[in-house]
Structures are given as structure tokens and as C-alpha cells.
């Protein structure tokens, strides 16, 4: 079952409602520096009553190999159970991505050292500095690990909120799929 039933929370797309507009993926990228952390591919459950897809996104596992394997303390579990990458200490070494059995961690280029949002540009403001960690030798780390953070610092999950048909939602698999025997 590719770990679907063991995860704390699963992103689910009702394929009977999905119109393949990519709003979910675009909305994710809009709040994650242009990087969508959602891939609309994954296992499907197709029965007479449901046509459900499980897009690739972080499982926020009970026993996360990425978290326990990180040598730089760049990952933590939040008080509400989500796995979070700490950008300030992430070296971009790729170990967490290699350890993730579900391939849900992406290695992305770090932002430049300044970041100007569109409102800043519109108002003619100076870009705000972005912290870029460096190695003990002064080398700047060029990559950053990213995974679905459930938009915990936002009032809603952007992918879910921006779906025009309500096709995408999060569930606790052990409750939602009681009695389901196989997911292909």
C-alpha cells in the first residue's frame, strides 16, 4: 500500500471531481518559492463507489527516516505532528531525500540572497535579505530540501483552498479507508 495507511495524513484527489486544471499544484508553488511540493501522480483506488488518487506529498510519518537520519538537525516534528524542514540549518546534502521511502522530499535551488515580492517591486521597496546558511569554511549552501508542510503557517492548505471543485482534501487514512483492502 506504499505506506498510505500508515501515514498521519494523506492528500486525496477525488478523480470524479478533478478537472485537471493544476490549480492545486500552481497554488502550492505560489507559496513555496515557485516549487510545487505536490505531484498529481500516485497510487489510485478505483472502485464502484470511488475513484481516488493519492498525489505524492509528505506522509508526515510516525517514524520518519528523514528526520532521524538528518545529521544537521535540519528537521523537526512540530507540536501538532508535522515534519518540518528548518531552512536555516539545512545544508542541502540530500540525505533526507534518499532516506524517504516515499520519495516526497525535493531538492531545490535556494533563493538568491535577496527576495523582492511583487508588492515590494510595485511599491519600489528594497528587497528583503534572505538568510543563506554557510558551511564552516564559508561556502554557501546552494540547495534546500523541501516537502509538503501542510501550509501550517497559513490559514488554510493552499492546494485544497484553491481547488475550484473541492476535489482535493486531506484525510487520516486509517479512519477514512476503513475496510479498503487494496490500493494500486
Language-model features: locations:
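Flexible inter-domain linker/hinge segments
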Residues: 1-8
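Local sequence-structure signature of Cys/Sec-based thiol-disulfide redox active-site neighborhoods
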Residues: 11-15
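Short Cys/His-rich zinc-binding micro-motifs
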Residues: 18, 59-61, 90, 148-155
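Iron-sulfur cluster-binding cysteine motifs and their immediate structural context
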Residues: 22-41, 63-89, 95-113, 125-139, ...
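Short, conserved phosphate-binding/catalytic loop or strand-edge motifs used
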Residues: 43-46
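Extended hydrophobic/aromatic segments used for targeting, binding, or gating
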Residues: 48-56, 62
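Intrinsically disordered, low-complexity segments enriched in small/polar residues
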Residues: 118-123
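Solvent-exposed, charged amphipathic helical/linker segments at domain boundaries
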Residues: 143-146
Amino acid at each position: 500500500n506504499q505506506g498510505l495507511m500508515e501515514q498521519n495524513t494523506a492528500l486525496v484527489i477525488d478523480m470524479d471531481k478533478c478537472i485537471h486544471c493544476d490549480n492545486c499544484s500552481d497554488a502550492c508553488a505560489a507559496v513555496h518559492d515557485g516549487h510545487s511540493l505536490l505531484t498529481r501522480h500516485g497510487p489510485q483506488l478505483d472502485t464502484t463507489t470511488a475513484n481516488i488518487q493519492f498525489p505524492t506529498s509528505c506522509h508526515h510519518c510516525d517514524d520518519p527516516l528523514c528526520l532521524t537520519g538528518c545529521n544537521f538537525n535540519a528537521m523537526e516534528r512540530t507540536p501538532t505532528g508535522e515534519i518540518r524542514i528548518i531552512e536555516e540549518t539545512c545544508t542541502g546534502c540530500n540525505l533526507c531525500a534518499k532516506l524517504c521511502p516515499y520519495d516526497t522530499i525535493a531538492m531545490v535551488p535556494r533563493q538568491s540572497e535577496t527576495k523582492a515580492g511583487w508588492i515590494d517591486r510595485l511599491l519600489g521597496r528594497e528587497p528583503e535579505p534572505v538568510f543563506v546558511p554557510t558551511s564552516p569554511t564559508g561556502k554557501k549552501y546552494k540547495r534546500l530540501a523541501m516537502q509538503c508542510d501542510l501550509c501550517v503557517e497559513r490559514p488554510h492548505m493552499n492546494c485544497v483552498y484553491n481547488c475550484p471543485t473541492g476535489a482535493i482534501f486531506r484525510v487520516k487514512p486509517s479512519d477514512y479507508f476503513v475496510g479498503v483492502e487494496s490500493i494500486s
